[in-house]
A protein has these predicted regions:
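Substrate-binding/active-site clefts of carbohydrate-active enzymes
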Residues: 100-107, 116-286
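Short proline/glycine-enriched turn/loop motifs at strand-loop junctions of beta-rich domains
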Residues: 5-12
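Beta-strand-rich interaction surfaces with strong enrichment in secreted/lumenal proteins
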Residues: 25-29
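A cross-taxa feature marking solvent-exposed loop/turn segments within ectodomains of secreted
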Residues: 21-23, 50, 143
Length: 286
């Protein structure tokens, strides 16, 4: 079964390679609380809906029919030919964390090396989690650091944003590799005595409709305030409405997810001034 909450949506379907991309074959049901759900009988989908399957939502809202990626997707990939992003059902064998009992508090005062996984390599092109693990972590350790801070690594469509225009908050950037390769990076860092800090972006999200969570239910205020109040003009992005219970649940579950699933040791929260001030930190006090 699968469950989504789309309060402003009129109709929601789920489709993918498991049903030959038939958009309106599997209709989700909405309950009294605005939660949409669909049930997939095991006997029917055991051999079709499996690890690696691709899927999307077909959502009918006030902005028409849109093909969307679920907000809680844990793996999102880009088609090389069309450049479109699609959610991927990701259910590999459980990662072996045996022996990873790292305690960052024992490192004392932190000497933090900040790095961008894709840009830290000497080669031309986008670096990978595996390359960072094999080539960069030993250098960080050798130079005397005891912590590494990874710049924004959640899925993002525009590489030039350095990862700060997030589209899928629960999915590691697929251009750098698989979730398991990111987990291996963290595990190896811990073996070297390095704490791993994640740069977490909860101040805003990308405006894109095809890839992101903007207007996911067909309204402009599903995760944000309506109109200009939900727009960050300096970053050309959308602002979260932290007063909504659902937004708080979404962001807090995201905090817990990266700690539990990837064993990150802590966070550096990006754009905090934009989260707590109406002027977003762009103000002249003279």
């Amino acid at each position: 079964s699968d469950v989504y909450k789309r309060q402003g949506a009129h109709d929601v379907y789920v489709f993918g390679d498991f049903n030959n991309w038939q958009r309106t074959e599997i209709r989700m049901q909405r309950d009294a609380h605005g939660v949409w759900s669909a049930f997939f009988p095991e006997a029917m989908y055991r051999d079709r809906l499996r690890h690696g399957s691709l899927y999307k939502l077909h959502v009918h809202g006030d902005n028409g029919w849109k093909d969307r990626i679920p907000a809680y997707a844990t793996r999102v990939v880009q088609d090389e030919a069309t450049k479109n992003y699609t959610a991927q059902f990701w259910a590999p064998e459980p990662f072996d964390w045996q022996g990873d009992a790292f305690d960052a508090s024992k490192n004392g005062s932190l000497m933090i090396y900040e790095a961008h996984v894709g840009m830290a390599q000497e080669k031309e092109g986008v670096g990978t989690y595996r390359e960072f693990t094999e080539k960069i972590l030993p250098i960080i350790k050798k130079d005397g650091y005891n912590a590494v801070q990874l710049m924004a690594i959640a899925e993002h469509p525009y590489y030039g944003s350095f990862g700060y225009h997030v589209s899928s908050f629960f999915a590691p950037a697929s251009r750098c590799g698989t979730p398991e390769e990111l987990k291996e990076l963290v595990r190896r860092a811990h073996e070297l005595g390095l704490a791993v800090i994640m740069d977490l972006v909860h101040a805003h999200y990308v405006r894109n409709l095809n890839e992101g969570i903007n207007e996911l239910d067909g309204t402009d205020h599903h995760y944000s305030l309506p109109g200009k109040a939900g727009y960050q003009p300096y970053w050309d992005s959308k602002l979260f409405d932290y007063g909504k219970d659902e937004v708080q649940h979404f962001l807090l579950s995201n905090v817990k997810y990266w700690l539990d699933e990837f064993h990150f040791d802590g966070y550096r929260f990006d754009g905090v001034t934009s989260m707590i001030y109406h002027h977003h930190g762009y103000v002249d006090f003279d």
